[in-house]
A protein has these predicted regions:
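Catalytic cores of the polymerase beta-like nucleotidyltransferase superfamily
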Residues: 1-450
């Protein structure tokens, strides 16, 4: 036990208090305790108790209750429209499918419940009455920045293969080191990740790749990543004999991920996949230099394939694949081409592309970084100026509409075609986005083509 105090939110304190008043041990448990000790704001407050589910429902009969988790001893209380999961102390049976316990049995000992959890930093409980209960050294591992399984790591990972990805995800989020026995078990059992639903793999991958220490964590367990997402195997073992590079493709990708400077999931995924097609197109010239002609197109195709397999939502998949396709873009210096690109992407996607291109550039050979980054900074400055001026980049911003064209006699497809021509004229600076000027231009056009 520890004398440390954790500030509980009022609903959580209320639940613990009512259970204690009725003779049942109850604790905040798991991630909320870990995050509190790290001085982070917990996303969820989970509660564990000696009370059985039916008793929990009885004690909180004055509160809306969801009974969807009764099979595993979980009751969800809705307080101020926020869900609080309350789960009876339990021990898990065998994990025949390598993902879920075949059965659960209730217990009256909090230590038995904590013993079934994945990592020591997640196996702590707290109540104001007892302080922190930490039978597996979670506080010490937090202090020493260590990721360690509870008990035998091979057993923990064999029970539930998703824990492999969770381990790497926590290393990526917290910047902690996975201790040797736990990391050895990750290596030994990485192929069992195939038991896990693709959606769950994607959820963990996304959390890991967007985290501050993503590169370090992925570098520690590449076999797991490549087994979870087979297309990413193409990053491994691909040299880049070129004056523009000092790393092979895998290390280049990790260095770029270190430099991404954002937790935007679309940008982070794009960096992870941006060179995944290089292996397929690599050639070596007579001068000994490697070339990767068409690698952006190939990488985008692999990206689309991988994200479909992972059941990524369509919008994210399309945006990521687009960034991968364009990541090697030389930003046009001509005003018209620049604005057309900006209009095609929109500001949000354009800024993502700049972030991806900058991270990619920072992972190149030192001599070429400065010029690349200056060009990107200039492009960002120009885009910001246009955005601040609310420059017209879309039909929505154009000062005339289809109804105006109908008044001049345009019909059907001609309306859309003409609006797009006018928009392009505005983008190129041939016409101002001024309603009177655009209407006058239309009038002259129709008179000329009568």
């Amino acid at each position: 036990m520890s004398g440390l105090k954790i500030a509980l939110p009022a609903p959580c304190a209320f639940i613990l208090s009512r259970l204690h008043e009725n003779g049942f041990e109850a604790y905040a448990v798991g991630g909320c305790v870990r995050d509190s000790l790290l001085h982070k704001t917990p996303h969820d407050w989970d509660i564990t108790t000696a009370a059985k589910p039916k008793k929990i429902i009885e004690l909180f009969s004055d509160i809306p209750v969801l009974e969807t988790g009764l099979k595993h001893g979980t009751v969800t209380l809705l307080i101020d429209h926020e869900p609080y999961e309350v789960t009876t102390f339990r021990v898990d049976g065998d994990y025949t499918d390598g993902r879920h316990p075949d059965s659960v049995a209730f217990t009256t000992d909090i230590r038995d419940d904590l013993a079934r959890r994945d990592l020591t930093i997640n196996a702590m409980a707290y109540s104001p009455a007892t302080g922190i209960i930490d039978p597996f050294g979670g506080q010490e591992d937090l202090n020493n920045e260590i990721i360690r399984c509870v008990g035998d790591p091979h057993k923990r990972f064999s029970e539930d293969a998703l824990r492999l990805m969770r381990t790497i995800r926590f290393a990526a989020v917290l910047g902690f080191t996975v201790e040797p026995e736990t990391l050895r078990a990750v290596h030994d059992l990485h192929e069992t990740i195939g038991r896990v639903a693709k959606e769950r793999i994607f959820t963990e991958l996304l959390k890991a790749v967007c985290a501050p220490y993503a590169a370090e964590a992925l570098r520690a367990a590449p076999e797991l990543l490549f087994c979870a997402v087979p297309q990413l195997k193409n990053l491994k073992g691909v040299p880049q004999n070129s004056k523009y590079h000092i790393y092979d493709v895998w290390e280049h990708t990790l260095h770029a991920l270190e430099s991404i400077g954002t937790d935007d999931p679309i940008a982070c995924l794009a960096i992870l996949f941006h060179d995944v097609g290089k292996k397929a197109v690599r050639t070596t010239g007579e001068d000994g230099y490697d070339h990767f002609f068409g690698h952006a197109e190939k990488s985008a195709a692999f990206t689309d394939e991988a994200l479909r397999t992972l059941h990524c939502d369509n919008k994210t998949r399309e945006n990521v694949a687009e960034l991968v396709l364009l990541h090697d873009t030389a930003f046009p210096k001509r005003t018209a081409k620049f604005r057309r690109l900006l209009a095609k992407l929109g500001y949000e996607q354009f800024y993502r592309l700049l972030a991806v291109s900058r991270a990619d550039s920072l992972a190149h050979a030192p001599w070429c970084i400065e010029d690349r980054c200056k060009a990107l900074a200039d492009a960002k400055s120009e885009a910001e100026s246009l955005q601040k001026a609310d420059f017209c980049l879309s039909l929505r911003q154009l000062k005339i509409t289809g109804k105006d064209l109908q008044a001049f006699g345009f019909q059907g497809k001609a309306i859309g075609e003409t609006l797009n021509k006018l928009l392009d004229a505005v983008l190129c600076g041939q016409l101002p986005n001024d309603r009177e000027v655009l209407l006058l231009h239309l009038e002259r056009y129709t008179q000329k083509h009568k």
